Each structure stands twice: as structure tokens, then as C-alpha cells.
């Protein structure tokens, strides 16, 4: 039997990294008896080691809690634990769409941060009831009144009735549960209407196939029902219905307003796309739910094994990861310098780092990552054999003939940065250096909120690291894409001994090409070992060399065996050596060690 709508509450928790979101979720589970003391572990909802270590949530998780409130009624509380990071913004928007309210968790010592804001605004767009929870009130540095003022000034939410809590110490947990019941509205829905359910998330389970997280809007989901995904157009037979408490629990059915999971013998996560609408195959709904969009990769980079024999292992590992992450795309590529590998697409830099870290950690692979690049749009003029067309460029090495390119467009983002006043100057300079356009600057209680428009290309490298180091870790940063704009961009190639090295080519702005090229050449000069002949290292745009360094040759003393005698004998030996070196320079291969590549790519943006 499904729970009456009036006794269901669906809510998510919005918080910046490290503000105590997962700990609060743990305490709510513990208080309502979802797990016994023995089963309780820190960060129950974060399954991956990386999630626990970095203190971030990557995949959305859901827990159904049963809570008997002070009014004597027993309520079904569905907690959606959502990712907090900008790379997973679309997953967050779908998770929020499945709820009617949200707990806004703010650290009593840190105050409101940029990422919190982005998710709060999304929550407000979904007409959510937002309950502020000020966490970590037992810290010595906690300043509750200041944080209340920030919530009111920055977000515009009344904070006088905010719940004061310390998830770690277990303070304010019951008050939080009572606030959820009293302030978050129950869902609306009709059990008799045709089935409409939103696909909130999906992941691969080796025993059950793809497990699909759904929020039922209208109708009822039952075992043995034939369902249809409206966007993908595929039909499936449900073989299991249930919920997480957080243990997997099988149910007979899931009704309107409820959140649960279904499995249907699906083998590929790509078929179960986040945001799709699930309906009955025999009596389908009239229209899918709004807001669905295809997730497009934003950042691309090449992944190569350091040992060529690991290529098959890398292929298998990437395919396994893809089972759980449909937003991650890959295709095979080969490079003269690095051998065989894959060109992979990611939602953003954190996504790239996580995939890379999971490959090295879970699959024990040693990887080289080429410089990340973004998606450029090229307008090509017509030729004798081809009409004019627009193409997307994911890999700088595939850049067509510059004479055919009429215009290159690059993606831009709008970034919101929060920073304490004393670090404002250096941060503004950093944004200016990255071709940023300042849009707004406001002050809120000792902190500045800066809005900048920046090219994504300039942010992709190490913008976030530089931002953190300049502000000693106090700045927080959030961004969203605002479309493509034309730019004066050129492809910079690196030539070692007059041979282009494809893995090091990159697309740069013409204004910064020279300094980037010079930096790269200087670095390679330090990294490549000396050979028996001299090696030129050049950075070039088209046919024009913009920077050059030369690695001097090692010298072998060929005249050492001559004692006295005629000077022409020595001359002859030196001439012969000169000839040999000339021939070596023409035919000799320069051995670029793997470490040189890794260091050059890692340092890709200091030039």
C-alpha cells in the first residue's frame, strides 16, 4: 500500500563542500532508525572512496526514512543526497525537481559560499520551501548571528527561524526533522492518472543490471509492468521495485509522490538517461516531463597508458566506468609520441579528475593525461570540392588548414567568485589576465562577490588552483556556460628537432601565444636529456616560429688519441665528427622521456 500524499515529504540537502551535508544525512538516518549503531559508518550515502576522501558527493543517492513526529503521525521522508559541484549541475537540477523542499546547510564558521548559492537559486526556481540549517554551532569560530545575516543579505531568505545544529555532536537533529515535516509541503499527484515518473539517476549493478532511481508524479509503478522511456523511446519490463532505507528494500509498488528504484534487466546506463520520463507502455502519458536535456561533454583530453602493454587494460577499465557514467564519452586515438590511447569527454574539470583518479586507483593504471581542451566551433569556407560548413573541434591536433577557417568560436562561462576583501586585488588581476570581462562587483559583510565572463579555455587549466592559492583557500567559485563567442585563436604546435609533437599542440589566444610558447620551450629544454647532436625546440603558429630554445649536443673528444703529429690529422677527425653529427641530426630520433611529457602537460599554463 502506498503512503498517503499528506504524509510524504521529499527534500534534498544543499551545501558547499565540507559544510557537513553528508554528516547531517548520517545523523538523520541514525535518528530515524534507518541503520543500527553497528551498521552506521561515516558518510553512509557516499559509496565511492573518492567521495569519502574528498568529502564530495558525485552520484545522487536517495534514502527513505520513517519518522514519527510530535503530532503522532508517521511520515515518509525521502532524502535526496545531491552532488554539490558545478560539473554535476544537471544531475542536481533533476534531483531538485524530484523534491518539494530543501535543507540549506551553512557552516556556522564559514558562512555562505558560491556553490551553495548556485544550488539555492536552482532550488528557488523549482519553487522549493527552503529550511536554513546552521551547522557546526559547537565550533569555537562559529558566529551564528553573522551567518544568519549573510543568509538574509545574500540569498534573501528569512533566517530568524533557522535550525541551529551540530551534526557531528548530534545537536538539533530532532528539530531538523520537525522543521521538514512542518515547513516542507507534501507532493501532489494522482494515483488514478496514467503513469508519469521522472528518472532521477541510474547506475550499474553487476547482479541487477541498471538500477534506476525514479520519482513517481502520477500513477503507480508495479513489478511486472511494461514501461516506456519517453525520450529514449525504449520499452522494458520491470522485474524489481523498491527503495533504500539506506539498505535496499523490495516493495510491491511505488505510488505518487514517492521516490524509489526499479530494475528492468537493462544492460547499458546510456539507455536510462537522467531526466527522462518513465510511463506505462500500454497507457502512455500525453507528454513527457519538461526540463530533459542531453548532457554534452564540455572538456576533452587524451588518456594514454605510460606502458603501451596496458592499452587493453585501459580499454576495459574505461568501458566499466562508462557503465556507471553515461555523461563520460570516449573514442580511440593514437599519437606518434604517446602510442595508443583514448580521447575522452567530461562534464568539467572535477569530473575529469575523478575519472582519472578512479582509473589509477580502482584499476591500478599509470596514465598520461594530455592538456585538457574545450569544444571549439569552426566556420570553414568552401573549397573546390567542399561546401562551406560548421564543424566542432575536440582535439587541437585535428585542426584543419588555417586558410579554410573563417572564424573560430570558443565557449564562454559566467563565473561568480566570493572572496574576502583583502584578496580582491590579486583575484581581479587573475581574471583580467585570463581575458575576463567584469560584470558586477558587490560587497556583503567583509566579502566581495565578483561576476566575470571568462573564456572556458582559460579556466580549464589551473584557474581554480591559482584562485585558491592567491586567496589562501578562502575564495569560492561557481560557473555556468553562456554560449560560444568568436575569438582570435590560433593553434600552437611544438616542434622537437623539426618534428611536430602532436600531444603538445594546443589552441591559444594570439595575444598570449608567445609567452605560452616560450614557457613551454624553456620547460622542455630542462626536461629533454642531451643527445649527441644539438636539438632545436620550437613553438610555431602555422609556418611562423614564435619561440625557440636549443639543447646543446654532448661532445665526444675524437682527438684524444692523437699525440703530437700533424694538425691536419686532428682537423680531419673533427670534420668527420661534424659530418656524422649533421647526419645524426637529419636521421636521429630524439628520445623524449615520459616524465618530460607529464611535466610539460601538467605545467601547461604557467608560461
Curated annotation (Swiss-Prot):
| Organism listed in the record | Sphingopyxis alaskensis (strain DSM 13593 / LMG 18877 / RB2256) (Sphingomonas alaskensis)
Positions of GTP binding: 18-23, 135-138
In Swiss-Prot or TrEMBL terms, this protein is called Elongation factor 4
Enzyme Commission code: 3.6.5.n1
GO cellular component labels: plasma membrane
Name a single GO biological process.
positive regulation of translation
Q: Which family does it belong to?
A: Belongs to the TRAFAC class translation factor GTPase superfamily. Classic translation factor GTPase family. LepA subfamily.
Record's InterPro entries?
A: EF-4, EFG_II, EFG_III/V, EFG_V-like, EFTu-like_2, G_TR_CS, LepA_C_sf, LepA_CTD
Q: Where are the transmembrane segments?
A: none
Q: Which residues form the tr-type G domain?
A: 6-188
Sorted UniProt keywords: Cell inner membrane, Cell membrane, GTP-binding, Hydrolase, Membrane, Nucleotide-binding, Protein biosynthesis
Q: What does this protein do?
A: Required for accurate and efficient protein synthesis under certain stress conditions. May act as a fidelity factor of the translation reaction, by catalyzing a one-codon backward translocation of tRNAs on improperly translocated ribosomes. Back-translocation proceeds from a post-translocation (POST) complex to a pre-translocation (PRE) complex, thus giving elongation factor G a second chance to translocate the tRNAs correctly. Binds to ribosomes in a GTP-dependent manner.
Indicate where this protein resides in the cell: Cell inner membrane
Q: What start and end residues bound the annotated signal peptide?
A: none
